Amino acid sequence: MGGRYGINLLASDKETWSRGAIDLRDFPELLDFAVSDEILGVAAEYLGEVPVLGEMQLYVTTPMQKNVGNNFYHFDKPYSRQLKFWMAVEDVDAGNGPFTFIPAEPSKIVREKVRYVGRMTDEEVYAAVPESEKIEFTGAAGNALWADTCRCVHFGSRARSRNRVMFELQFVTPFWWAEPTFYFVPTLYDAERYKRNRMQSLALKLLSKHPPGEGHLGDYE
């Protein structure tokens, strides 16, 4: 029986839904990449304001015989706007299930015609817009994609013959209302590393928002 397994790279223990945990002091290059000028520049241009890092995940999907959950077409939760960055860690093709989405404008038609609630079958979506509208993210390891998964109807990996491994970043606006998946545990990272760069420190604002008495590395070391 296959499925999707996520490692929350911003959580420092196993109290979240994540299958794993990480100390970013051991892997500073991950956060350096997430808040690099190139990445933040794209997110800022789309969102129209300073982007805030909401997620950093590593997803592994193992082969499955039938579609479940996010293998069906859906929209992400109704945030006003968000932007996700996906990078293939290994080559992606039809055998390990490409991330598949429909651009924002035809996705609006899907939302209206299907009267969207929850998940949708391929048949429901393609009755609203032609199947030719879909875009499949395939290619060699290192290839990357940006998509607003709140506005673009999409589905995750339908791996059939081999595993798929993807690295994901989520960027939201400073007024994002939902609690991040790492809210109840501190994110262990070197806060001093980013303090001199105003854009980076703002992008990492959620990492220090924890219940009283908890916080990022800089709060207790």
Protein language model annotation of sequence segments:
Residues 56-58, 104, 149-151:
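Short, well-ordered beta-to-alpha junction loops that form the rim of enzyme active sites
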Residues 108-221:
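Conserved double-stranded beta-helix
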Residues 1-71:
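Non-heme Fe(II)-dependent double-stranded beta-helix
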Residues 78-94, 138-139, 146, 170-173:
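Short, conserved beta-strand element in jelly-roll/cupin
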Residues 70-77, 152-156:
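Histidine-centered catalytic micro-motifs
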